[in-house]
Structure formats: C-alpha cells, structure tokens
Design a protein with these regions (language model features):
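Active-site loop immediately N-terminal to the catalytic Tyr-X3-Lys motif
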Residues: 78, 123-131, 153-154, 195, ...
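Residue(s) in the substrate-gating loop at a strand-loop-helix junction
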Residues: 120
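Active-site helix of classical SDR
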Residues: 100, 136, 144
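Substrate-binding pocket helix/loop in short-chain dehydrogenase/reductase
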Residues: 76-77, 84-89, 188
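Short C-terminal tail/terminal secondary-structure segment
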Residues: 125, 208, 219-233
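Alpha-helical segment proximal to the catalytic Tyr-Lys
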Residues: 105, 149-153, 216
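Short, flexible catalytic-loop segment of classical short-chain dehydrogenase/reductase
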Residues: 158, 163-173, 177
Length: 233
C-alpha cells in the first residue's frame, strides 16, 4: 500500500495475536516497526504514563500509531467487582489514552500522522459477559471520533477497526472455559455470513489501509471486520 515504506510505526500489544499480524504486515511494506508490549524488549506497560513517555521519546518521530493492546475476561457483570473493572479500564481505555497523549503532540508538531485504534464490535452492539470491556471499547471509539474532529486540520487521521469473532488466544481461552469448544466454534462459524471466523491477518489488512496514503480522506470512522456478523450503516 502507498506511503508506508520507511514510516516509524508503533504497535501496542504487538507481541502476539492480532498485534503480531499487524507488525508483520507493516514490516512487509517496509515500515520501521516498534512494539510497545509487556513481552517486548524493552517491555512497555501502556498503563504507566511515565513508561509510555520514555518509550515514545526513545522511538523518535512516530508517523503511525496502532493502539492494539487489550485484555478481557468473560464474566457476567454482577459477578465482577471494582478491582476487575479497574484492570479492564487501565488496559483498554486508560492505556490507549496514555499512548495517544504522548504520541499526538509530535504528530501535531510535524503536521501529519495516522492513528488506528483496535476496538471491538462489543463497543458498538454490546456483548454478554463483557460489560466493562464493551464500555472501554465504546469509549475508545468515542475518543477517536473526538480527536479526529480536534486534529483534522493538523494533518492527523484517526480511525477505528472493530474485529468480529477472530481466532486469537483470548477467544480460544473463552471457548475452552465454556466447555465443548469445537461445538462452540462451529456455532460461531455458522453465525458469520461469510462462513468462517476471522484471522488476525484479516484485521491487519484493514489497519494497513487506514494507515496508508490511500486513506488520507478518511478520519473519525469505525470499520467492522467481522465477516458480516455485524453490519452498520
């Protein structure tokens, strides 16, 4: 895709799953990729503002940011507690805000930048057993729209990608915990109009498009990559 070669690109949560697929696609396009992850070297905890500041300073002028890091555990809301909420909020909402707050000033100064945040269709339509997570993902969608308006004249484009049911470790853990994972996998597959679950590479393709020069006239948008499981007007 146009305009990715040589771009300094930060991917949070890029050590595994969807994040790792995004990293590989950017590298294939010639981007210089830096991973912010607890498992990266050096490790970066996005819930720690000072740690993010240091990592951003060390990265140099960041052209593209992919806010991908996230975590969830499926629990009915009435069986959760404030400590659980705080953990979900710290990783899925405060973490992306920390990274944005540290990265965006440099983009504003240079007059250009692309930001793609990975949310979830849980933040658009809700998802049973994911109340705090859904709230966070709805929050980052609203945050992105607001920042897209604030920074549109500064040359910065911010958009959201919402994965649907995607083959990741988090989904696998949920299915194993629910019992009879193969039966559940087949039920999920039948629910998706295109007839399969998503792959991390499916999400990566959408992210790269939004980060490329081909998406220069797109900002403040939320794109579901769900095989048609959710369809939004």
């Amino acid at each position: 895709m146009r305009g990715l070669e040589g771009k300094i690109t930060v991917v949070t949560g890029g050590a595994a799953g969807i994040g790792a697929a995004i990293v590989q696609r950017f590298k294939a396009e010639g981007a210089r990729v830096i991973v912010f992850d607890l498992k990266s070297d050096p490790s970066v905890d996005i819930t720690n503002y000072e740690a993010v500041q240091k990592a951003v300073a060390a990265a140099g002028p960041i052209d593209i940011l992919v806010n991908n890091a996230g975590w969830d555990m499926f629990r009915p809301f009435l069986k959760t507690d404030p400590a659980f909420w705080q953990k979900i909020l710290a990783i899925n909402l405060v973490g992306p805000m920390n990274v944005l707050h540290c990265v965006l000033p440099g983009m504003v100064e240079r007059g250009s930048g692309k930001v793609v945040t990975i949310a979830s269709d849980a933040g658009r339509v809700g998802s049973s057993g994911e109340a705090p997570y859904s709230a966070c993902k709805g929050g980052v969608i609203a945050l992105t729209k607001t920042l897209a308006r604030e920074l549109a004249t500064k040359g910065i484009r911010l958009n959201v990608v919402c994965p649907g049911l995607t083959e990741t470790g988090m989904l696998e853990s949920f299915m194993q915990g629910a019992g009879n994972p193969e039966k559940l996998r087949e039920a999920y597959r039948r629910a998706v109009p295109v007839g399969r679950l998503g792959k991390p590479e499916d999400i990566a393709g959408a992210v790269l498009f939004l980060a490329s020069d081909d998406a220069e006239f797109i900002t403040g948008q939320t794109i579901s990559v769900s095989g048609g499981l959710t369809m939004h007007g």
